[in-house]
Amino acid sequence: MLSHKKSLDILRKTNALLEGHFILSSGLHSSKYIQCAKLLSYPSKAEKICKSLALKIKKNFRKFDLILAPAIGGIVIGYEIGRILKKETIFCERVKGKFTLRRGFKIKRGSKAVSYTHLRAHE
């Protein structure tokens, strides 16, 4: 698992870590924002970040069935985490401001999903 410092170094080197004042889609405010598209321009670095996230998920969520990623920016990150953890991965999309399952995706009753909407960077 990458150290927090190493993760931030990768995000800075790929210009994925933006610093300033951001109002996230949830309405939360943040002084930092991770632009996943920038990170994904560097597959080997993105793989390291995703592997580290996957290990953290595995450590903190012992029993789960699938990864639920947000569209659009989180789809590739979710895919890579699912690949590493060997878990089904689906994504949701915003429809009128609410995350919604579309494209035939369903979550079976009783299934446990790990979901994320904002990956916030802090020091």
Where are these predicted regions, by residue range?
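Conserved hydrophobic/aromatic pocket- or pore-lining residues that grip, position, or stack substrates
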Residues: 27, 67, 89
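Short, glycine/charge-rich flexible loops or terminal/linker lids adjacent to PRPP-binding catalytic cores
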Residues: 77-115
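Short glycine-rich phosphate-binding loop at a beta-alpha junction
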Residues: 63-71
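Active-site-facing substrate-recognition patch
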Residues: 2-62
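Short, flexible coil/turn micro-motifs enriched in small/turn-prone residues
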Residues: 15, 22, 68-69, 77
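Short coil/turn segments at beta-strand junctions that form active-site/ligand-binding loops
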Residues: 62-63, 111
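Glycine-rich beta-to-alpha active-site loop
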Residues: 74
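Conserved small/polar residues in nucleotide/adenosyl-binding loops
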Residues: 117-123
